[in-house]
Amino acid sequence: MSHIPVDKGGPLTPHQDLHSEQGALRGEHPGRAQNPVIKVADLAWLEFEKPDLDRAEVFARDFGFAIAARTQHELWLRGTFAGSPCMLIRRGRASRFLGPAFRAAERADVDRLAAAVGHGVRDIDVPGGGRSVALFDPSGLPVRVVHCAQPLPALPEQPPLTLNTGTEPRRTNATQRPPREPSRIQRLGHVVLETRTFARTLDWYLDTLGMIVSDFLFLDGQRGRGPTMAFIRCDQGSLPVDHHTLALHLGPGTGYVHSAYQVTDLDAIAVGGEYLAERGYQRSWGIGRHIQGSQLFDYWRDPDRFMLEHFADGDLFSCDLEPGWAPMSASGLAQWGPPVTRDFLGTSPSPAKLREVMTALRGDNELDPARLLGLMKAMSS
């Protein structure tokens, strides 16, 4: 088998100079389901449990969230865009990720999905009210599909800087002095999840929620065994959407890796990063620009060690673009920026990580010694 040929002298193909010149080989995963149950419109919010809501709120404000609602037991965070909240944090004994909630395109989709899986529809106590159906993906992660009755109104934006570019000067007799303040979050962009059952979990999101793949990554020398990472977007037809709303990758763990939140521009990322650093928070990796998705990025750890990303200027794809295919490597994570850190890759050795690997290798899943060695090679290449 050989790669799909690309004619450098002809018109651009969907993979030439767009996101990957390598399309699928014959018989490889198509990256979408023919007849999904529904097609979700976007991520709605992410749900966490934490013991200290006061500390969580301090970080949230420093990171750039606005507070949508606060009770003794719940903290709802939001961005400036109109719509649903970005995050729900419930008070609990331990810090843990509870799962994502996806936004249904219309209320009838919640009922249709509930009927298809045999689950009930329930009211949800979200600002503005709404309805939801609760599911589990093949990894065992709780997933909700929701429809909010009343969207939150928009909040004031952090305006982008007016830039002088080449022969198009737009700013004269004025200086650039962006204030040292939090990067004002606009919206939730995506969540990245790790799973030991990559193939089954991927197919579940495509079959059940109607999502489609933008890019596949595969391990060196193991392409014939299928991909080990997928960047997945929502299918809204001709309407351009984020390159990925969800990313899945094979690994020894199960659950949350990081989540990403859009801000105005590069200066908002940089100044917000300075603000976080001055307050003693840990940068995990950044600032740089990704390859898959093209986002400008900056990754930070919250006080509970969860990783969150500020991003701007990401790719937008319509439903027409077919998946790209590329080898997985640490050096392939960014077009430019500082070297990727061990903290970001999760490769720092620890007793907990060793137990996680041993448990995965003994279990009935897709992580075998060859896959593990391939992942280790990718993270060092």
Label every model-predicted segment:
Residues 32-35, 87-88, 177-180, 244-249:
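Short beta-strand/turn micro-motifs at beta-sheet edges
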Residues 153, 161-206, 216-218, 224:
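Non-heme Fe(II) oxygenase catalytic core, chiefly the N-lobe of the double-stranded beta-helix
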Residues 199-288, 295, 303-304:
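Structured core of small recognition/catalytic domains
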Residues 1-34, 41-51, 91-115, 118-184, 230-231, 280-381, ...:
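Vicinal oxygen chelate
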Residues 77-82, 91, 135-138, 232-236, ...:
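Active-site beta-strand termini and strand-to-loop segments that position acidic
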Residues 26-120, 124, 129, 365-381:
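The feature marks the first
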Residues 2-17, 38-84, 193-241:
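Core segments of cupin and vicinal oxygen chelate
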